[in-house]
Amino acid sequence: FFCLSCTNDNGNTDQYMPTPSPLQIPQLFEDTIIPPVIPLDNPQTVEGVTLGKKLFFDPILSANNTQACASCHSPRNAFTDPARFSVGVDGSVGTRNSMPLFNMAWNYDERFFWDGRVFSLEHQALEPVTNPIEMNTTWDAVVTKLQNHEDYPQLFLEAFGDVPITKELTTKALAQFERTLITSNSKFDRH
């Protein structure tokens, strides 16, 4: 009789077990709108949302560590930018205003950017990092910074299991957080 065990020295299994984090959908939406769009390969998890939120507010995604997603998608302005043209890294001025990021879970046609050129929230998050005006860096540089950071390796491990940090996992975490940005009680919503 031969038996193998999949536990480590302290008796815990090394199995990846993320904590599901269903969206907190307002009753108004439950009553009047079809369910949100959540990709099967990127389910909402507590760990993924936590990682995505940290990434969203951290300027580590930009070339000179000065520009975060929240720099243009400001929580003080309902995750929008009140400026006519958004300002990127090194003070470079873009040609458009950044899009608002609330209620993204209900973007049924899955088209992003003002011209609709990208077809998922996960893929949308890829472009600002490499845009020369917005964050002006490469994904290889970002992944290296994340791998060498004191917090991110553990956060990625908790969110996605024992796999290497990649640009795809980074954008999945960002998308999970962005799907939690739900508005339903503003003056506009109540009208």
Report each predicted region and the residues it spans.
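Periplasmic c-type cytochrome electron-transfer domains
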Residues: 6-191
